[in-house]
Amino acid sequence: MAKPALKAAKEALVVKNYELAIEQSKKALSFDANNYNANVFLGVAYFSTKQLSESKEAYLDAIKIDEKAVLAWQGLWNLYESTHDISELHKITPILASKFLELEEQNKCLNTVNKYMEVVKKYGNKADEFKALKLLTPEEGEIYEYLEGRVLPLQTVYMQMVDIQESMDRCYFESEVNKRKTRLGARLEQVMRDVELEIYKDSPLETLYNQIINYAETDEIRRLTESKLLHMYNKLLILSEIKEKSHWRERIWDLIQGMVTLHIPEQAAWTIYFEWQDHSDISFFQSAELQEYIELFPGSPLAQALFAFRNSDLWHKEHPIQLEDSNNSAELAKETKEEDDSENSVDKKENEEDIISSTMMPQDEVLANLTEAYENAPQSTIISECLAKYYIHLKEYEYAIGLSKAALEVLKRLQQDTGVKLDKLTRIFQLCLAIGYSHYEVPRYLFQAMHYYDILLAADPRNYHALLGKGLVQIENEQYSDAVKTLGLLLDDHENDPSLSELSWCYFKTGNLPKAISTVEKCLDVLLSMDVERFKIAEAYYRYGIYILNRKSENYLEDSFSAFVSSLRKDPNYAPAYTSLGLYYRDIHDMVRATKCFQKAFELDASQVEAAEALAKTFAEANEWELVEVISRRVLNTSENDLKRKKKFNWHHTSLGVLELNAKNFHKAIVHFQSALRISPKDTNAWSGLGEAYARSGRYVSALKAFNRASILDPDDWYVKYFIATLEKDMGEYEVAVSTLSEILAVRSKELCVQVSLAETYVRLAKLYHARGFYSRAADSLEKSIQICCNVLKEDITSIFSWEILGDACLSFCQLKNYHNRFPNSLISDILFTTEAMKCANNGRQFENMIYLPDLETSSGAIFIAAVAITCFTIHLSLVADDKLLLPVSWYNLGSSYYRFYECDTTKDATLQVAINCIKQAIKLEAKNYVFWNMLGVLFSQTKAVRSAQHCYIQSLLLNERSSGVWANYGALCIQNHDVECANAAFTRSISIDPDNSQAWLGKAYCSIAVGSIRKAVQIIHHAFEISSGKMPDVNYWYADTMLHAVNTEDFVTTDGDIWSATYAIKRYLGENPTDTFAYYIKASLLEHLGETTDSVPSAIRLCELLEQEYDVSESPVILKRFIDAKALLGRLYLAKKSFENSVEQAGIALDLLEGEEDEDIKRTTLGLNLTCGTASFFLNKLEKSLDCFEKALLVSDSNADVVVLVSKVLWALGSENGKQAAREQLFEALEQSPSHIGSLLCLGAIAIYDEDDAVCSAIEDSIAHLKKDEVLRSGALKQVQIMEVLLTKKIDESMIKSLLQRFLHVYPFAASSWTLLTNRYASKSLANAFATTLYTHPSRPDDLAQSYRLQNSIDRAQVAIHLVPWDSANWKALHGVTHEALVSSDAS
């Protein structure tokens, strides 16, 4: 029943009636569910109608029924092909291909495979392609064998598989590294290693490479694949664990051995072949192998290094050429056989030398090739070995050390990466390190050298090079006994070794002279019988000469001389022998030959320090300092000698320090002296040189330390102490410097340089005293300086610096106007009026057109002193007329002295012109000195030559725009010419350069005054005074003047401290200007405000005397007016002093002088004088006269309220009822005109209390209560107002006193009197604390604050009160009281 359905289904498929075919197939399956063909037909029909899942199911059902049949497999394959299901194709294609193979359907098999390849290539990825290609390999079955010849060859298949795998590995590596490297704590190097290990661990590449090698059709492909396989093995070796490295190492070695054996030109293989073999010398490798490598890879770094090294002088020295091995071996052998006599032997030797020289490269080419090779391949141990050995050969020890260290690191990494351990090669680099350290910067690295020698000897106790090197290091370390033992071990194996010479030296150093001589004699026999370097024989002869010289036997000088000559015959370039010969000739006083020998020794070897020192001394004695410098620098630059401990010399550093010091290279000089002191810390000369270098470079503290150290090492060296004193002087420690110089003179009293320095120090000390206001001390110092200068000039009238210092001292004396009487006129005259001094002043120099000499004999006082200064500087100018360095300064000093003379006598304009000419002359000689231009500007300013002065200041600023003083002077010039804007800019620039320039600040104040900013000017002047510390006279004057103005006008709040500071300032000013009447007036007025009559009265008397003297000379009305003001001031001061009679007298004199004058100023003066006279008369009980004066004052003042109060007081004091009534009336009238006049209110209040007039008391109390706060504070009667209010309140209603005081304190919280009344009346601790806290937080007087602390009734507060006002006995009593109470309470408890 199924057959008809199958037949119908087949026919429907043929006509492509797929629906019918499906129907008939299903019908057939309904009769026979296991019918294979029905399932196949159903799968085909479903596939054709795109019902793929049903088709797949049908094919699978068919395969289950019969797996061996092909149709279902073929249909399923076509289904997967159409859906591009690569994964299923991978599974089914081998099966289908195998089915065709069994059926021997080769074409169908081939077509299936080809289609499979096309689909995979088109729709698959790299992994799919790899899997598809794998089907065509023998490992996958018989398909390749069946289709061989019709598919790709195996070589191609495997190569394509390799390309695909390598591509996949690269993509995986890049993606994984990028992904993992961003993880926290990841290191890129480790990430890359991990990913590479993952790739190579299960990689099929090894198998593929081997298959390519096996099936390769050409040698080129085989070699390329072998190279890849080697690279892979090397990677796996590096990445693998330690236990696995031997496996990969064996594989690599097998691979490269085959390559080398077959002479395959694979560079990596050959390189590993050489690099992995442990060896102690390049000669370990077969020459043919080395030559073959060079020929195979001529451009490689290793080939370059091997070729250069094998053709170097070092190689030929260690491996002498064999003639029979040369290219001309046959011919040379024949010549050798035929020529046996001595003459022919010489020709043979010359022929050998020619052959060697023809094959040898120059040293520079060898080094260049080796260096280039190493730079291109620094990981090559063989290149490092060649270059390190060659560095040692060239004595380039520093490079050898660095290279050997790097090579040892390479070997260490090689062992870590590959497990290859190269012990012999390691010892080669350790030996290079040891040798390098033995010779580089000796003895700095000798410890390291000994360390490596010990390592080498631990591995091989009989290592020749290690024993010899260790022995030499022990000799260098002066361990001669140990060196004897070490060299003895060496000589046990090498009896006739040249090291006998070193052994003899050890015997000599240990004192065994006979053994040393016998050993060196044996050494000479050995050396003369050997073909060794001439240097070795020369050294042995030299040492033999040294031993003979020290034995001092008969004819020892001649024998040692003969040995030294023999040394030079063997090696004419052996420098120590020349040094010894030089010493020999020097001892026999043949200095010409000695010098020649020393020169030759030093030319050959700069480490011959003894020869160098002898040469340096010789040239220094001949003043050939350039040659001394050359020798010293060469010694310094010789590394073999510079750091040797056994030769502790520092003369080269000292001499270079002196040379650099003279060349003004102070930093370099310091370095050299420090180096000298490191070598010899007790070298006094080096300490002195270091101190001088420090001093001349401005580092005075360091210089002082250095000189003090030198002084400790040599206390008797007065020159060091002189330098110390000079430093102390330069540092401003003048008193200490005076003490030091005096100590020197106590021992060496005739040293003129010390006396001159002491005189200069006294002058500087005087200037310091003058700046600090110690004028008497300044005069003392100047007297001593003048005395010393005169003493020096008596010894040497041409002492240049003495004349200069004497002139400077005289100029300083001119400023001490109160002490001119102490100037030693006679002492100066004894010097100046001598014939020798006159000759010095007029020694033939043509200065007549420039210099005007003042008349010393007719001068006196300041003029005489200035004239003496001019004469001193004139003589100084004459003495330095030929000195181009000192002459400009001398002209400047002379010009300054003439300017000082002009300041003392301004009537002599000629002196000012001479001063200008002198400064001009200084500028001609030194036009770039900004100080000279500044001084010329000052002088032109005095002559009103504004343009010239401006030009000079600008020129000075062009030379040095950072000079604050010049800017200040330029500002002063501008303000003198009313250019305020320019002056302000100049002063601002000056302050920006030097913020502590008080003169510039004073100039800023002038500018502020010029533009009307008085308050700002006062602030600036106060700041200028603070920064000047009272040292600037002009600032002192203006500070005191502004303070007096502030006190008189009450424009600014001032304290007693401010007034005391102003008083101090004006006193300092008067100390330098004792005849300034304006300053005396300011001083007396300030003291008047302070209530200090003790000092103010003498100042006012002196003021009157000076003004009287001026008036007698000039009879100027201005002076007369000032004299009257001075008398008025003196009268007030006498009144304050309670010297009433003197007060009346002085006021009377002034009033008499004012008769007939009517202007406003006269009226004010008359008013003050009448008040003074009236008040003084009042206290003298001359009430009538007092009343008369007050009435006159009342008339002059137009019934001024203050005057009315005074008149009322006098009327009341007269005692008559009429007088009292008149007083009341006067006060009422005054209050009508000025209702808030505090004085009138207080006076009338007192009268009302006396009269018990409650109505008036109430009215006065109300008026006082309504007074404005500013009016009370301005009047200065706060305390009186408060007391009056209390009295009036007590009179009216006593119970209101507390509220009154509280209200008063609310308005005036700082009123100490109110707090006192409140505290005394209502005592409490909280009130006392409030009192103290309030005063502490408000500006208050120390006395009031102390009182507040005192009332707190505690020990610590009482102590604070004492600290504030220690002179107040109340504070001490309070402390005593609280202390007593505390003791009593403690006893009671």
Swiss-Prot record:
Subcellular location per the Swiss-Prot or TrEMBL entry: Cytoplasm
An annotated GO BP: nuclear-transcribed mRNA catabolic process, 3'-5' exonucleolytic nonsense-mediated decay
GO CC terms, sorted: cytosol; Ski complex
Keyword presence, Ligase: no
Pfam families given in the database record: TPR_10, TPR_19, TPR_22, TPR_8
Top-rank lineage group of the source organism: Eukaryota
TPR repeat intervals: 2-35, 36-69, 90-123, 381-414, 429-463, 465-497, 498-530, 538-574, 575-608, 650-683, 684-717, 719-751, 759-792, 931-963, 964-997, 999-1031, 1124-1157, 1167-1200
Key words, A-Z: Cytoplasm, Repeat, TPR repeat
Region of interest: Disordered: 326-355
Assembly with partners or alone: Component of the SKI complex composed of at least ski2, ski3 and ski8. The SKI complex interacts with ski7, which makes the link between the SKI complex and the exosome in order to perform mRNA degradation.
Functional summary from the UniProt entry: Component of the SKI complex involved in 3'-mRNA degradation pathway.
Protein name per its UniProtKB record: Superkiller protein 3
